[in-house]
Amino acid sequence: MAGIAAKLAKDREAAEGLGSHERAVKYLNQDYAALRDECLEAGALFQDPSFPALPSSLGFKELGPYSSKTRGIEWKRPTEICDNPQFITGGATRTDICQGALGDCWLLAAIASLTLNEEILARVVPLDQSFQENYAGIFHFQFWQYGEWVEVVVDDRLPTKDGELLFVHSAEGSEFWSALLEKAYAKINGCYEALSGGATTEGFEDFTGGIAEWYELRKAPPNLFRIIQKALQKGSLLGCSIDITSAADSEAITFQKLVKGHAYSVTGAEEVESRGSLQKLIRIRNPWGEVEWTGQWNDNCPNWNTVDPEVRETLTRQHEDGEFWMSFNDFLRHYSRLEICNLTPDTLTSDSYKKWKLTKMDGNWRRGSTAGGCRNYPNTFWMNPQYLIKLEEEDEDQEDGESGCTFLVGLIQKHRRRQRKMGEDMHTIGFGIYEVPEELTGQTNIHLSKKFFLTTRARERSDTFINLREVLNRFKLPPGEYIVVPSTFEPNKDGDFCIRVFSEKKADYQVVDDEIEANIDEIDISEDDIDDGFRRLFAQLAGEDAEISAFELQTILRRVLAKRQDIKSDGFSIETCKIMVDMLDSDGSGKLGLKEFYILWTKIQKYQKIYREIDVDRSGTMNSYEMRKALEEAGFKMPCQLHQVIVARFADDDLIIDFDNFVRCLIRLETLFRIFKQLDPENTGMIQLDLISWLSFSVL
C-alpha cells in the first residue's frame, strides 16, 4: 500500500514539472542552498550524514571495512590536502581526470567526453562553486536518473592514502571538481565500489539524459556514415577510440599519430568529389590537441588539391586545434569503437538541430506476477509488461532506398548498482517487438495472451540478452502498431525499469493492459426456491438459532474440504470466514441465514470448479501465474499493477496460492466492487470518501 501511494504522489509531482533540469529532485531530500546557509550561519563545515566519511561509503568487498586496500585511509578536505585548492580552473580539461585505485575508467571516459561540451558540463557540474566564496564544505551536482534529473549533495571529505587522493584526481593535484563529481556519483549508487566496471554509455546517459548507442567498427552496419551524419544534425555527442590490448598500450601513439585508449570526438561527416568520385570524410577532434593524424586527408595532404576550392575552404577554415579530416574507410580501419549519445530535445538549446522525438515508459517486473522471463518460458512470458508504440510517419529522407520509421529502443534496469551492497547485481535483460495483428489494431485494453506469443514471431528483438544496465538497439520498421515486451532472461526476477524510444518522427505510445472489469454473477433467489435437501442440511449445521457464525462456518468448510482429494487445503482461516460473512450479512447480525448461506455455498462450489480447472498440473494448488486466468474465469479483469498487489498479498514464499487465499481474494474483490458500485451509481469511475469512510472500508 505504501509503495502504491508513493508512486501516485511521484506521478503527480512529475506532472507538475518535478524532475526536470530546472526543478531537479533533491536526492534524499537534501537541499543544497539551505544546508550551505545553515553551515555558513553556524560557522561550521558540512558533514553529510547520508554518505559519511566511513568505510561503508567506500565499499563492501574489495573496498570493504576489512579489506587490505582500505587500511590507512584518511578522509580529508581539499583544504587539508593542498595550500590553495580550486574547484575548477581554466575550464575542464583531460588533466583534471586521472584514474585512481578504482575500476571506473568507463566513468572517467564519459567525464572526459563531458568536458568537450561546456553547456552540458555546466548542467552536471554547477561552476559557481569554490573553496573561497561562501565555502561551507558542501558541493552539489546533477545527474539524470531513469527519466528525471536529481541533485546530489556531498561534503568535500575525500578518501586519501599517504596524503594523496585515493580515487580520481587532477594531474596538478590542486583541482577538485572531478573528485567531488565522482564522490556524488558514488553516493547516488551506494558507495565507491559500486562504480567498479561499466560501460561508457552509462556515464554518457547519466550526464546528459540522452540515449547512447555504440558500434564495433569492424562490424559497422552499411549505413553507418549516414547514421553519423544524422546524429550530427541532431546535435548528438559522438566519441571514438582505439582499443588497447594491455596497460602498456594505453596512450601509445601509432605511426600515423593516433593515440590508443584515447577519447576522440567526431565533429563532422561530409562527402566531397575528388578525382571524379565521391569520397566520404570524417572530421575528428583530439580534444587536447597534442597530436594529429598524418595519413590520407590530413591538413597537409595533397588530396585536398583535387577538391573544389570553395568546398576545400568551407571544410578547412573552421579547424580547431587538434581537429583533422580522414577518409571514412581509414576511420573504420584504424578506430575500434564509435559511441553516439543522442540528446533529448530539452538538452539542445539551439533551433538549428533536427531534434529526436522522445517517449519514456516506466514499469517493473515482480516475482510471481509480471516477471515472466524471456521467450524460453512460454507459460509465463506473456505475463511481462507490454507497451504499444504507434509509428505513423516515415523518415523524411530514406537512406539506401529503404522506406520506414527509424527509432531507437533502450531498456534500462534501475538502481542495480545501488543494490550491489546487498549482494545483488545486474539482471540479464532484453526485449522483443511484435507487430499488432490487424484485428487488434486500435485497441489498448487487451494484454496479449499466451496463445498470441505461442503463434507469433517477434518482428524485431534486442541483439542479445545481457547483464548490463541498458540494452539498446536501432530499428527501422514500416508505419504501424507494435508491442514492445521487456523481460529478464529468467522469470521471477524482481526489478524496476524504464523504456525509452527515440524516433525521427513523433511516435505515440501507451501501456497495453486489461481494463478493470467485474462481471459478478447475481444469485437472485428467495427462501421459497431453496430445495428441501439444502434446508435440512442448513438446519443440521446452523443449530437452534438457525444462523451460522464465522466460527461455525470455519468448522463446516473444514469438514467439506477434508473430503476432497483434488484440492490441498487445511481448511479456511477465521479471517476468510469473517470476510465471507461480512459480504453476505445483509441484516448486520454477524451471521448467515438460510438464503445467505445458500448464496455463499453456490459461490464456493463455483470457486472450487475454477480452482480445479486452472490447476493444469493437478498439484491440488495454484501458482501465482495461474491466478490471472483464474480471476478472469471468476469474472474479474485487472491490469498488471493490481495483479502485482494480489500476488504480494495472497501468494506464499513459493508463489503458491492455496484455496483459502484464492477464495479470500475473490470475496474481497467482489465486496470492494459492490461497495464502489453502490457509491458510484452513475458509473463515473470516481468516488469521494471522508477519512472515516476510507478507514472503515480499508480494514475490510
Swiss-Prot record:
Binds 7 Ca(2+) ions. Ca(2+) 1 binds at residues 658, 661. Ca(2+) 3 binds at residues 91, 96, 175. Activated by 200-1000 micromolar concentrations of calcium and inhibited by calpastatin. Ca(2+) 7 binds at residues 615, 617, 619, 621, 626. Residues 345-514 are annotated as: Domain III. The keyword Acetylation applies. It is found in: Cytoplasm; Cell membrane. It is an enzyme of class 3 (hydrolase). Its main location: cytoplasm. PROSITE patterns: CALPAIN_CAT (PS50203), EF_HAND_1 (PS00018), EF_HAND_2 (PS50222), THIOL_PROTEASE_CYS (PS00139). One of its GO terms (biological process) is cellular response to amino acid stimulus. Coiled coil: none annotated. Ca(2+) 4 binds at residues 292, 299, 323. Signal peptide: none annotated. Residues 515-529 are annotated as: Linker. Its cofactor is Ca(2+). The active site is at 105, 262, 286. Residues 2-19 form a propeptide. One of its GO terms (cellular component) is plasma membrane. Keywords: Acetylation, Calcium, Cell membrane, Cytoplasm, Hydrolase, Membrane, Metal-binding, Protease, Repeat, Thiol protease. Calcium-regulated non-lysosomal thiol-protease which catalyzes limited proteolysis of substrates involved in cytoskeletal remodeling and signal transduction. Proteolytically cleaves MYOC at 'Arg-226'. Proteolytically cleaves CPEB3 following neuronal stimulation which abolishes CPEB3 translational repressor activity, leading to translation of CPEB3 target mRNAs. This is Calpain-2 catalytic subunit. It comes from Bos taurus.
